Curated annotation (Swiss-Prot):
InterPro entries: Insulin-like, Insulin-like_sf, Insulin-rel_pep, Insulin_CS
Sequence intervals crossing the membrane: none
Protein name: Molluscan insulin-related peptide 2
Family: Belongs to the insulin family.
GO CC, one annotated term: extracellular region
Binding partners and assembly: Heterodimer of a B chain and an A chain linked by two disulfide bonds.
Length: 137
């Protein structure tokens, strides 16, 4: 009877340890959210104009400037900043004759750092006002 009890106890301990280990491995760190291209909005997440309004409300209570939405019509490329290419002047470009192998060219590319943003933290995950306050500036 003691032998059976000991086996059951060991199996129980192993099961508990594996469960705890898997629970620790799967959970993201406290206060950090992760998003990917396949992420979907959280059932209690705040998205779109609701998120912008929530952020403006939280930040206005901290005497911080509210977020200004970028005008889609003007965008970032203003007509006066665009330059039409000229075939004659492009021939004088000192970088024109630089040739690199694919391997060499790829060494100049760096992997983007994975960062979380307000949409990731509050739309695709559940967030609190304290999380939103981190995005007040």
């Amino acid at each position: 009877m003691v032998g059976v009890r000991l086996v059951f106890t060991n199996a129980f301990v192993v099961t508990v340890l594996l469960t705890l280990l898997l629970d620790v491995v799967v959970k993201p760190a406290e206060g950090q959210s992760s998003c990917s291209l396949s992420s979907r909005p959280h059932p209690r997440g705040i998205c779109g104009s609701n998120l912008a309004g929530f952020r403006a409300f939280i930040c206005s209570n901290q005497n911080s400037p509210s977020m200004v939405k970028r005008d889609a019509e003007t965008g970032w490329l203003l007509p006066e900043t665009m330059v039409k290419r000229n075939a004659e002047t492009d021939l004088d470009d000192p970088l024109r004759n630089i040739k690199l192998s694919s391997e060499s060219a790829l060494t100049y590319l760096t992997k983007r750092q994975r960062t979380t943003n307000l949409v990731c933290e509050c739309c695709f995950n559940y967030c609190t006002p304290d999380v939103v306050r981190k995005y007040c500036y």
